[in-house]
């Protein structure tokens, strides 16, 4: 029976390359000279430190820009709230989403079942498996999921006959 998986994975090596690009630009930009602006990554978290809101918003735009340049979807970033940090600086923690969370998986499964297509959707950990009798049904299901306007980037893998 034909099947495919819906996953949401972000290449962390490319994320690190994007962060390195932001760091290089931070060192060279005139408006950041002499400021206490830093960006660092630990696993799936990126931490932005800077002095004021305008610099923080510029830093956010730089991160988004470098994500696009590295062919990463900025929708994979979950922007935390801005917090006051030591020394009168601002801190923002950004999480890189990996995998499909349960709420989103349930939303996709519900949409597939409500469409009355001849496919079955099952949640397997942080990914979805869609199976059907015909490849055409699976392709129609992919079109349906793409049309759901989901912010998180999704990939369609393991397309099997």
From Swiss-Prot:
Species classification: Bacteria, Pseudomonadati, Pseudomonadota, Alphaproteobacteria, Rhodospirillales
Sorted UniProt keywords: Nucleotide-binding
InterPro entries: DUF520 (IPR007551), UPF0234-like_C (IPR035571), UPF0234_N (IPR035570), YajQ-like_sf (IPR036183)
SUPFAM superfamilies hit by this protein: YajQ-like (SSF89963)
One Gene Ontology term, aspect cellular component: cytosol
Record's protein name: Nucleotide-binding protein RC1_3464
Domain of life: Bacteria
The protein's role, per its UniProt record: Nucleotide-binding protein.
NCBIfam families assigned: PRK05412.1 (NF003819)
Classification via Pfam families: DUF520 (PF04461)
Family, per entry: Belongs to the YajQ family.
GO MF annotation, one: nucleotide binding
